[in-house]
Amino acid sequence: MRAPRPLARIARYRAPALAICAAAACAATVGCSGGASPGLDWNDEVVKEIEAWRAKHEADYRRDWATIEGLHFLAPGTHTAGSAANNDVVLTGALPARVGRFTVEDDHVAFDPEPGVVLTVNGNAPTPGATLRDDDADDADEIVANGVSIVVHQTGERLALRVRDPNGKRARGFRGFSWFPISREYRVLGRFIRDQVPHEEHVVNTFGDIDTYQSEGVVQFTLNGQILRLRPFTTRPKHLYIVFNDATSGSETYEAARFLTAELRDDGTTILDFNEAYNPPCAFNPFTTCPIPLRQNQLRARVLAGEKKYPERVEPPASAAR
């Protein structure tokens, strides 16, 4: 059985002991005493950078996440797959009637192409029976036929085929993003409070699967006079990935979560710019899998910054059910 990727249930979450005592926390944290945060720039260039970031973010999502047309789960064994109804797995998108056969054994998926069908794997002729690397890796194997791509996707212990069609229904219907006005008060300086020992967080995602992330501490900051903490995941050295929601979730913003990324400085501080808080792709595409915030990342404060909710509600597909 494949090890789960992203917590034992969020309700059971308990933060590990922090590397500093509570009495010293405020003294060691930027912004506890109020006033302007040192080392935090705000000028026309910062505003332009946020505007440029938002434009690039939407363009990236339009090119990538908006093109996902389907997520098709695979049980152990061998399955025919293609667009025709007589396949074991009927794929969405403008694919051939039969693409080939996918064999699931343990935590691997092997692919045998249908004879005579024109397709490539990573731009080359396919090797029958080759094992496909899933999209958790930077070098995932990509099957392409008729301009439509297929990759293996893992969510928790389950494996699926993820189909992308740049000319498909979802790509054509993508409605773009809307944002709160850029605001200086939502760009704050935080201090990273490191745990005594790094650990893994097992996080429930929107499909009910469990994924695993590395966590090394919390970020403490002051927002609108409130001292708050968020626990980021560490996806690479000094890069903080924060999954949170707040008192606007479900009304002004997407109900499940928003994401925020930040870079950790050598002095232990980081800029949290909530003007760049953004929705996960599951806010507009039901065939994506997204983590749910840890309990301590569910803020009672209202964060009126960053991306607003998508203009139409998107429900997870029936195939998401466990």
What are these regions (language model features)?
Residues 249-251, 263, 269-271, 275-322:
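Extended, aromatic/histidine-rich regions of cofactor-dependent oxidoreductases associated
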Residues 2-21:
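Bacterial N-terminal signal peptides that target proteins for export
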Residues 28-31:
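C-terminal motif of bacterial Sec signal peptides marking the signal peptidase cleavage site
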Residues 68, 73-140, 261:
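Forkhead-associated
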Residues 189-249, 254:
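Flexible, glycine-rich surface segments
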Residues 144-211:
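Surface-exposed beta-loop interaction hotspot
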Residues 33-35:
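Bacterial signal peptide processing site
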Residues 37-89:
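N-terminal cleavable signal peptides for secretion/export
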